[in-house]
Amino acid sequence: MPKASADYIWMDGELVPWADAKLHVATECVLRGENVFEGIRAYWNETSGQLHIFRHADHIARLRQGARIMRMTIPYTDAEIEDACLTLLRANRFRETVHFRPVVYFAEGELTQYLPDEIRTGMFILAIPMPSKSSLKTGVKSGVSTWRRNSDLSSPSRVKSGANYHNSRLAYIEARLN
């Protein structure tokens, strides 16, 4: 099981010690899951002694597309996001395969309805060691869930958003407990 932490998180333009990276409980990110993210893998190559990021630019483009659908303005350019990811990976000195996640979120609001330009948009990137799953070699059991994917007409399921992942969490729990 990978450790669920690293030395640093990149948060709003700065490297922050893992234990000091905090969001207020009144953020829309916490209260309503208003965020978009990408999950990206960087594979460790022992021979070259380097991490190799899988389709980094494509993931950043999809992050930006999801933010656009959610009417969030990412406060960084694609080049700045890519540089932030590299800075974070280097600062943590990983020598193993890593999963990292850039997250764009709405910050503190008025706890009522608001327009996107009336609320601050923040960003953080976290990275943790995550080796390949053993199921790649052993296979998996499968089943049909009673939970159905949310309609794209009610909540854009094509967007990687924290709020959208509750649906898949319910299906996962059902599969594990049955």
For each feature predicted by the language model, list its residue ranges.
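Helix-start/capping segments and mature chain N-termini
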Residues: 1-75, 80-87, 111-178
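Short, acidic/charged, Gly/Pro-enriched secondary-structure junctions
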Residues: 82-110
